[in-house]
Amino acid sequence: VHTHRSFRNPPALPHAAVVETLERALRDRSFEGEVADTLVGTALNDDDHAFVEHWCVEVGTRAEPGSPLLGLAGLCLGHTARRFGRLGDEAVKLAESLASRAEADPADVDGRAMDGFDDVRSFLGLWPSQD
């Protein structure tokens, strides 16, 4: 029997459900597993730019060192930059910081943060000049 695996992007959830899930995981690491679909679905499918950016920044600043939520937040900032074509200064600085931390110590922040920062630089035109 051949099994076909399928991939689907998670849907955006109502804001109240997003806030509840993210706050619970930020208070108690045992709930971190619930966050991936919630944050990715929000970053990919929620049309409220301010809400999406706010929660990517919240997760990226409040998650503990070594938490997989840090790399996820960086990745989702990249999705947000791609979708909306803009990020606030705090979000850009956070994406850069998370990527730097991932490069320095992947046990602190996983490599998804570097992918996210690449997207931020690409979609916001922030690549360093090649003088």
Predicted regions and their residues:
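N-terminal "cap/leader" segments of large eukaryotic alpha-helical scaffolds
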Residues: 1-37, 130-131
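Eukaryotic acidic, Ser/Thr-rich intrinsically disordered low-complexity regions
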Residues: 2-3, 92, 97-131
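Amphipathic alpha-helical scaffolding segments comprising HEAT/armadillo-like alpha-solenoid repeats
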Residues: 15-23, 47-60, 83-99, 126-130
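Structural signature of alpha-solenoid helical repeat scaffolds
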Residues: 30, 64-65, 105
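Residue-level detector of extended alpha-helical repeat arrays and alpha-solenoid scaffolds
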Residues: 32-36, 70, 110
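A contiguous binding-surface segment within folded domains or other stable secondary-structure elements
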Residues: 34-51
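Hydrophobic core positions within HEAT/HEAT-like alpha-solenoid repeats
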Residues: 36-40, 74, 114
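Structural signature of alpha-helical solenoid repeat scaffolds
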Residues: 43, 78-79, 118-121
